[in-house]
Amino acid sequence: MDARAINSREKADLKYPRNTYIIGDVQGCYRELQELLELIQFDSTKDRLGFVGDLVNRGPNSLEVLRFLKSLSSPLIVLGNHDLYLLILGYGLMPEDSYEHTLHAVLQAPDKLELLEWLRHCPLIRYEKSLSAVLVHAGLPPQWNIKESILHAEEISTALKGPHYLAFLKNLFGNEPSQWKEDLEGQDRLRYICNAFTRMRFCDAKGHLDLESEGKTNQAPSRFRPWFEWRNPQEDNVDIVFGHWAALNGQSSAPHTHALDTGCAWGYKLTGINLKTKERFSVPCQSALRM
């Protein structure tokens, strides 16, 4: 089911899709993505696809993944930290050899700028009212309710789509500020918001981020917990679908939270979920890690 096959079909009206499938961190694992779509019997004229970010990097075929996703009709995509890293590299805001990556094919592609333009118009949060679900890459910090989270994510979308997106991206990296304050302004405000939605794993009850720890939930530093353990499912009243945290292996201890990163780029598996039925589907990794 490649991009050409989808492009050859008449674009479907997906306002009322038969099924909505959300896929975990693809990270350039194009072969596994296609195998997963075969497993779920995805029909682009009847079903809708969504992705919880980290579309690229670590796996071998990031370029193919981006071209395929761009060909889809109205995919539900949110950005992850690796996608933001690609934007920074792609626009020449950081030397290509600053970190190890597998993005060389994207950076050298003739349609690079077109792909980057498409990517930076993707949001950090998607709220699907009809399915009572929120898609986000890393999670939602405890000090914000769903409405506040959506509004803060829109601040990042405005920066990415606006005329000063290069300045925003150039100054995006960093762990500070790690504590949210309502009076944060400028790049500090945007950096905290972006880190919360794309990098957070552990935090405290007030949303102080620990961006250094990456282990399992029982390895949290003192006073910190996994972000989802601070949230109130009754207050949220939605399913929160997220990726980013491969160490969870797709397991979340909190009600109505669905972890989808099952470490495909690390040699494990790629996982998706049917948002209506909550049925999960997985395929094993076939691609050797390239970094």
Curated annotation (Swiss-Prot):
It comes from the Bacteria. It catalyses: P(1),P(4)-bis(5'-adenosyl) tetraphosphate + H2O = 2 ADP + 2 H(+). It is an enzyme of class 3 (hydrolase). One of its GO terms (molecular function) is bis(5'-nucleosyl)-tetraphosphatase (symmetrical) activity. The keyword Hydrolase applies. InterPro entries: ApaH, Calcineurin-like_PHP_ApaH, Metallo-depent_PP-like. Its EC number is 3.6.1.41. Pfam families: Metallophos. CDD domains: MPP_ApaH (cd07422). Keywords: Hydrolase. Belongs to the Ap4A hydrolase family. Hydrolyzes diadenosine 5',5'''-P1,P4-tetraphosphate to yield ADP. This is Bis(5'-nucleosyl)-tetraphosphatase, symmetrical. The lineage of its organism: Bacteria, Pseudomonadati, Pseudomonadota, Gammaproteobacteria, Legionellales. The gene is apaH.
